[in-house]
């Protein structure tokens, strides 16, 4: 008999209930809410090349603790997965050490340098999609050619949209806080100008296209209009962009990520985008760094914060408990839409949370090697008790 509450679309409910009752009866109890496991399309696992920041093992264990059983790993690695040989290095480590499913991106350009396209055809057999995340592809013709090749090979282009010429050495949003505290700002146009360019190229090429970490109101408006025009575009935003703005900034590296926390107006536009379906998924852009790299204040710290272990509870507390969206909608954003869009299987997997149990975010508790989060010290509702994959616990509290 079912005692826990299952929140899942009908096509997944039966499988989840069966696995819960047969394999994990201990978690079939009142007070627990069971979800299909989550899928994060934007994660930096740092291995190979930067395993002092995170490893595939530590990153996937952190994912499991957050309720995830699928993550898509970004290509800013060493070696960059820009050839089949290099991608196989990462796939080998995934096979040996990953605790959950990891689907790697291949890079759009060789070495992510933006100078020459990778062999998209040969990489298409192994890569989930193509991205140069961490930087935008600056050359219009190169991006157009990449889109044509991706379309030819049935793959998606996943874009970090940023015009380098507009960055001017900025490192936080070009808003009130930057002006008041003498910081160099990153203007919103550096993002939305490239979103606009890419959407024109998508119309021209017909490629499937996805925008990473949308942070500005203008980007949301452009994507909303493109969808109305029938363009094959989806996008994601991160929990921190939906919950915080530049008015929450402190002089601390844990508030530094790219794109930066924008204005309150931008934050509200992102929430509106989530509500009306313009933004179909929430992705963490989990980007771990060493303590030293994050200890140098806003100006000098590395860009990037972690997010896998707080994503559900952060969004549940600030979007669901506040009545902005339903719990069902949050599960669509975190578990259903990402898999559908990226054509990934719905695993035999689920996660169990106590949504009434609150906790104070303490990075010391994180499994991830990265400890920098703008949510440190905040109180969130929703504690993960179990994440199950193929009848086995990949995380238990």
Regions found by a protein language model. Name each.
Residues 1-27:
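N-terminal metal-binding scaffold of metallo-dependent hydrolase/deaminase domains
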